[in-house]
Amino acid sequence: MATNAQEDEPASTTKPLIGVVGPCAAGKSTLIAGLTRRGYRSRHIAQEHSYVKDMWQRLTRPDILIFLDASHPTTCSRRKLDWTEPDWQEQQNRLSHARANADLYLDTDKLSIEEVLDEVVTFVRSRIGD
């Protein structure tokens, strides 16, 4: 099986740090795994669990902030979450500062894993001139 050499590159400290935020089951962990395979430095920022609105800035200080979003029904179907619409809305409220300051916002409801990764990589490359 042929592999894309780019996917196997180790993450370089010369590449920007990409912060990824969003509600539970929006695709953050999957995106981070894909970015890592392609040689990018990325980190999940658990802003959805914090009442400190700018925690994403204080702890991580990402060069690029990606906000992945998903609707309440989608999050429930992806992870079989047993949470209510108000629970989901509370996460949205906790994420409002990060969403307002995100460099890229993606609604992942209708996107495949590959589409999310491709859109983010295209965006990051346009920002860093890669």
Ranges and model annotations:
Residues 10-12, 23, 33-63:
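Conserved substrate/cofactor phosphate-moiety recognition/catalytic segment
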Residues 20:
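Hydrophobic anchor at the beta1->P-loop junction of P-loop NTPases
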Residues 27:
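Conserved glycine(s) of the Walker
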Residues 61-78, 106:
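Conserved phosphate-donor/acceptor-positioning beta-strand/loop module used by diverse small-molecule
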Residues 81-119, 130:
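Small-molecule kinase domains that catalyze NTP-dependent phosphoryl transfer to phosphate-bearing small molecules
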